[in-house]
């Protein structure tokens, strides 16, 4: 099955700077949220471009240890970036993959980050709504922490 969430987050960070973060999140996240994305990011295949597969070692504040991601879209002109979580213990029993699509839309005085998350479950399994809500809330907290970091740097 498929479950989907769409979140739009306004920011006073410029669209260019916010998109730059998306492209560089592997180095920024451990600085901003070491307790979540703490240890390291290993490139397993590729050079950072579309098709790259990486293994993210998660921090102590999460119950999971690893997340395997594949880069699917890098559209610098359209300020779009998509990656899919394809492995690691973060994919709980019912999940096959999780697609994260980001589009940064410039606004007067900042941007809006549109984040669509698509949960692909095994067969007709359903991810419990509280898990979806928890993931959405964690993403919002991470976004606020990143925004504060980008505004300060």
Swiss-Prot record:
- Molecular function in Gene Ontology: abscisic acid binding; identical protein binding; protein phosphatase inhibitor activity; signaling receptor activity
Instruction: List the keywords (alphabetical).
Output: Allergen
* Transmembrane feature ranges: none
Which GO BP terms sit in this record? abscisic acid-activated signaling pathway; defense response
- Please give the PROSITE patterns that the UniProt record associates with this protein: PATHOGENESIS_BETVI
According to its record, what are the GO cellular component terms?
A: cytoplasm; nucleus
Q: Which SMART domains match?
A: Bet_v_1
- What interactions and quaternary structure are annotated? May form dimers.
* Family (UniProt): Belongs to the BetVI family.
For this entry, the protein name equals Allergen Pet c 1
């Amino acid at each position: 099955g498929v479950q989907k969430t769409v979140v739009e987050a306004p920011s006073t960070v410029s669209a260019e700077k916010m998109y730059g973060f998306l492209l560089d999140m592997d180095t920024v996240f451990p600085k901003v949220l070491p307790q979540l994305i703490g240890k390291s990011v290993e490139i397993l295949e590729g050079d950072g471009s579309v098709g790259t597969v990486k293994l993210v070692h998660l921090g102590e504040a999460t119950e999971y240890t690893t997340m395997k991601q594949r880069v699917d879209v890098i559209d610098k002109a359209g300020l779009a970036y998509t990656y899919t979580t394809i492995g690691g213990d973060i994919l709980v029993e019912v999940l096959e993959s999780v697609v994260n699509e980001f589009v940064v839309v410039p606004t007067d005085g900042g941007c809006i980050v549109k984040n669509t998350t698509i949960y692909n479950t095994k067969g007709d399994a359903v991810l419990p709504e509280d898990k979806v809500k928890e993931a959405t809330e964690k993403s919002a907290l991470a976004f606020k922490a990143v925004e504060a970091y980008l505004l300060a740097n």
